Regions:
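Acidic (Asp/Glu-rich) sequence patches and key acidic residues
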Residues: 1-119
Length: 119
């Protein structure tokens, strides 16, 4: 299984609609195992991540009002890709590429007034 990242908006209260995301593979957020080995790892928690660790237990829905904080967390994680890559066994390039995809989705969400779904 693969972990994907998408942007969404609410058409009406409680009715989520996924936006069209790029078709170039930039919707990839990692392998299913990266939920626990990377994004939900103790290392991610130790550096101060609060959104990403939710993936260890469930899909991550970043609500529109939390997108700015999520972008800040992406920047925090970006400063630790080498350690996260080593700790998870995925490698720095893998972590950096998946984090870049997630960050771009968050930036699209901010522009659209929407949120981010990692699932």
């Amino acid at each position: 299984m693969t972990l994907l990242v998408h942007t969404f908006v609410y058409d009406e209260p409680g009715k989520l609609r996924l936006l069209d995301d790029p078709e170039d593979g930039s919707d990839m957020a990692g392998f299913e195992s990266s939920r626990t080995r990377l994004w939900g790892s103790e290392h991610a928690r130790a550096i101060g991540a609060r959104f990403f660790p939710e993936l260890a237990a469930d899909d991550l829905y970043v609500q529109p009002e939390d997108v700015e904080d999520f972008i800040a967390e992406c920047e925090l994680m970006r400063g630790h890709t080498a350690e996260l890559g080593a700790d998870s066994g995925y490698g720095e390039d893998y972590v950096a590429a998946r984090l870049a995809n997630i960050t771009r989705a968050a930036l699209r969400a901010r522009s659209a007034g929407g949120g981010v779904l990692v699932w």
